[in-house]
Amino acid sequence: NVLDACRKVKVEQFLMPSSAAVYGDLAVLPLTEELSGMPSSFYGLTKLTAEGYLRIYREAFGLNTVCFRYANVYGPRQGDGGEGGVISIFNRLIVEGKPLTVYGDGEQTRDFIYVEDVVEANIKAMGNTSCTGIYNVSTNTGTSVNELITRFRAISGTDFMVYYENERIGDIKHSRLSNVKAERDFGFIATTTLE
């Protein structure tokens, strides 16, 4: 077990990437670290379970564990598979001249954070003893899928087709993560906007 090995060799800090998926579809926004997770996907449940292991190791053995709940990360060379890559999926389809498919009415929101901001959060946290426990790594800004489409139309200069289909079971309607705790404890503020 990695946590046992870290404890035995006295690792000073263990940082684990987690996900906004641990929250599920909670009605309160912004989502804060203190909220109890109600994952609506196996991915979110797996991340929440791993967070539980880290909490127990911190409490039982004093291992400084940090969980970063990443918002929807985007950036260069991102794969366009899976549910988290809507920006890269839309980008590829637009470049290929294909229509976009939106599940639901397009008013669902996500907190999109640029990959370089995520890297910056990790760097700021490493070795910082005041950084312990769970943190959201986010912009605290909700952007709807329809807003993304409007931005893609402006950038591409094309009026591509968009098809709306029924929302998928388990999809989260709104997600916006508070970044107050990360700013307070280790000075992290995302600087990149979708513009």
Provide a role label for each language-model segment.
Residues 1-73, 188:
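N-terminal Rossmann-like NAD(P)+-binding domain of SDR-like oxidoreductases, especially those catalyzing
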Residues 19, 27, 83-86, 90, ...:
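Activation loop
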Residues 92-195:
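C-terminal substrate-binding subdomain of Rossmann-fold SDR/epimerase-dehydratase oxidoreductases
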Residues 38, 80, 111-114:
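Residues at the N-terminus of a long alpha-helix
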Residues 2, 54, 90, 182-183:
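Structural element of the ATP-grasp superfamily
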Residues 49, 53, 57, 90, ...:
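Hydrophobic alpha-helix immediately C-terminal to the catalytic Tyr-X-X-X-Lys motif of short-chain
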Residues 19-25, 72-78, 107, 127, ...:
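Active-site proximal helix/loop that lines the substrate pocket
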